[in-house]
């Protein structure tokens, strides 16, 4: 039995080691082979073999390092080679699809958005494939070697098998085999992740939580959810990685949620619910500066910052409810920081202190007293979240090995 399993075990070790070496070169380059051996804790012979394969595949290149005062032969460092390797990053949201070409450094080559009707005679899968085909036709002169496709979207998703069980907004989606269909259509690997979880990964790799080992990221938008980074890794990355705080009950007598329950956090804290509440309460607050203008998240935040009592009360109410749920999560995960991704962050001076106070009042002091509550660096727009999926696939070696094999 051991002999039968041995080749697979060896392949996994090779993938893990190659990914670790690539990550070090990407993050620290130019870096010498000697330093790679020390940092990766691999034998010099192993480093030599891995680097040789990457050089032959044009995934890394050598660079002379000139050291001040050194008259001898310049040291040779390694850096990643990214410009000739592209991937498609795609994001599906309510009524819109974003498509972008990026190189392996995550640098944007071209990006555009197209309307994606919520209802159509054609199934959503067919329309997605059509948008991808047309995008490649429009930008074929800019396209280098296509390595992969990264897709982020809301819904209930089996990320490991690439199946979208359900999606909000697109009612015709049921057990959509998105990953398999696109891989067969394009011939490249497809990586799929919930948009909130992918955004959490992007912040950890490139943004506000870079370098932190334990992070909770909460998104308050049309939907409410959270992603968790624990010990440097996305929680449940291979399955349903979204933490469904939006469907945690906060009011048993509250409004019915689309999940079937009553009084979920999402029915109180989502952007749509907040604006609905503000509109309702405007009739009882004739002095509010929200009168006489379109009621939007921006106008609500601006009014709150200017001291409008109604706007402040609504935003602080959201903060208290979110903080109460976060206090439970803090007790479970003991994070270093909490990130908030929301259009309500325009009123961060009001929202964030309420969230912080709620956490400190209701979570264990040892876990909560040093936590910082900060805004995300990126917004949940565009295709940056998809870049995190490809970067992660290079770092864990799964995509890297495929590129090395040609």
Swiss-Prot record:
InterPro entries: ATPase_NBD (IPR043129), ROK (IPR000600), WH-like_DNA-bd_sf (IPR036388), WH_DNA-bd_sf (IPR036390). Induction: Expression is modulated by the cAMP-CRP complex. Negatively autoregulated. cAMP-CRP and Mlc work together to maintain the level of Mlc optimum in response to availability of glucose. Weakly repressed by NagC. Transcription is induced by heat shock via the sigma-32 factor (rpoH). Activity is modulated by glucose. In the presence of glucose, is inhibited by interaction with the dephosphorylated form of PtsG, which sequesters Mlc in the inner membrane and prevents Mlc binding to its target promoters. The restriction of conformational freedom resulting from the anchoring of four ends of Mlc to the membrane could be the primary cause of its loss of DNA-binding activity in vivo. Activity is also inhibited by interaction with the Mlc titration factor A (mtfA). The inactivation mechanisms of Mlc by dephosphorylated PtsG and MtfA differ significantly. The keyword Nucleotide-binding does not apply. Changing residue 257 to A: Strongly reduced activity. Zn(2+) binds at residues 247, 257, 259, 264. CDD domains: ASKHA_ATPase_ROK_Mlc. GO terms for cellular component: cytoplasm; membrane. Changing residue 259 to S: Strongly reduced activity. Keywords: Carbohydrate metabolism, Cytoplasm, DNA-binding, Metal-binding, Transcription, Transcription regulation, Zinc. GO terms for biological process: DNA-templated transcription; regulation of DNA-templated transcription. Changing residue 310 to G: Forms dimers but not tetramers. The keyword Amino-acid biosynthesis does not apply. Residues 33-42 bind DNA. It is found in: Cytoplasm. Disruption phenotype: Disruption of the gene leads to a threefold increase in malT expression. Disruption also causes the constitutive expression of ptsG. Changing residue 257 to S: Strongly reduced activity. Changing residue 86 to R: Can be bound and inactivated by MtfA. GO terms for molecular function: DNA binding; identical protein binding; metal ion binding. Gene3D superfamilies: 3.30.420.40, Winged helix-like DNA-binding domain superfamily/Winged helix DNA-binding domain. Homodimer. Homotetramer. There is probably an equilibrium between the dimeric and the tetrameric form. Interacts with dephosphorylated PtsG. Mlc and PtsG EIIB domain form a complex with the 1:1 stoichiometry. Interacts with MtfA. Global regulator of carbohydrate metabolism. Represses the expression of several genes involved in sugar transport and utilization, in particular phosphoenolpyruvate-carbohydrate phosphotransferase system (PTS) genes. Represses expression of ptsG (EIICB(Glc)), which encodes the PTS system glucose-specific EIICB component. Also represses the expression of the manXYZ operon, encoding the mannose-specific PTS system, expression of malT, encoding the transcriptional activator of the maltose regulon, and expression of the pts operon, composed of the genes ptsH, ptsI and crr. Is composed of three domains: a helix-turn-helix (HTH) DNA-binding domain, a PtsG-binding domain and an oligomerization domain. The zinc ion probably plays an important structural role for the correct orientation of the HTH domain. Belongs to the ROK (NagC/XylR) family. This is DNA-binding transcriptional repressor Mlc. It comes from Escherichia coli (strain K12).
């Amino acid at each position: 039995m051991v002999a039968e399993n041995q080749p697979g075990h060896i392949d996994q070790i090779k993938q893990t080691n190659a990914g670790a070496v690539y990550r070090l070169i990407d993050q620290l380059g130019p870096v010498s082979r000697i330093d790679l051996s020390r940092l990766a804790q691999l034998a010099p012979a192993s480093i030599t073999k891995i680097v040789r394969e990457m050089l032959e595949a044009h995934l890394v290149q050598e660079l002379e390092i000139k050291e001040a005062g050194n008259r001898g032969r310049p040291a040779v460092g390694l850096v990643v080679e990214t410009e000739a390797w592209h991937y498609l990053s795609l994001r599906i949201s309510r009524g819109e699809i974003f498509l972008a070409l990026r190189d392996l450094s995550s640098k944007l080559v071209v990006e555009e958005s197209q309307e994606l009707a919520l209802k159509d005679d054609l199934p959503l899968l067919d329309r997605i494939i059509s948008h991808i085909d047309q995008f490649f036709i429009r930008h074929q002169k800019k396209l280098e070697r296509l390595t992969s496709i990264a897709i982020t979207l809301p819904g209930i998703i089996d990320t490991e098998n690439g199946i979208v069980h359900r999606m909000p907004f697109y009612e015709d989606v049921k057990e959509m085999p998105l990953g398999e269909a696109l891989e067969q259509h394009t011939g490249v690997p497809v990586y799929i992740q919930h948009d909130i979880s992918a955004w959490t990964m992007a912040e950890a790799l490139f943004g506000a939580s870079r370098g932190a080992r334990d992070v909770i990221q909460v998104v308050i938008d049309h939907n409410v959810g959270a992603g968790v980074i624990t010990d440097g890794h996305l929680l449940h990355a291979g399955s349903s990685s979204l933490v469904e705080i939006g469907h945690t009950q906060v009011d048993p007598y509250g409004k019915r949620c689309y999940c079937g329950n009553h009084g979920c956090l999402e029915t109180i804290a989502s952007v749509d619910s907040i604006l609905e509440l503000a509109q309702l309460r405007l009739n009882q607050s004739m002095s509010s500066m929200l009168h006489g203008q379109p009621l939007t998240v921006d106008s609500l935040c601006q009014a709150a910052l200017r001291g409008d009592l109604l706007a402040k009360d609504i935003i602080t109410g959201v903060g208290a409810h979110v903080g109460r749920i976060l206090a439970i999560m803090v007790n479970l995960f003991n994070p270093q920081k909490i990130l908030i991704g929301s259009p309500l962050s325009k009123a961060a001076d009001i929202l964030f202190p309420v969230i912080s106070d709620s956490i400190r009042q209701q979570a264990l002091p040892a876990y909560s007293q040093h936590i910082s509550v900060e805004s995300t660096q990126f917004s949940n727009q565009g295709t940056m979240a998809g870049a995190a999926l490809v970067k992660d696939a290079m770092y864990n070696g799964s995509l890297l090995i495929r590129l090395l094999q040609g």
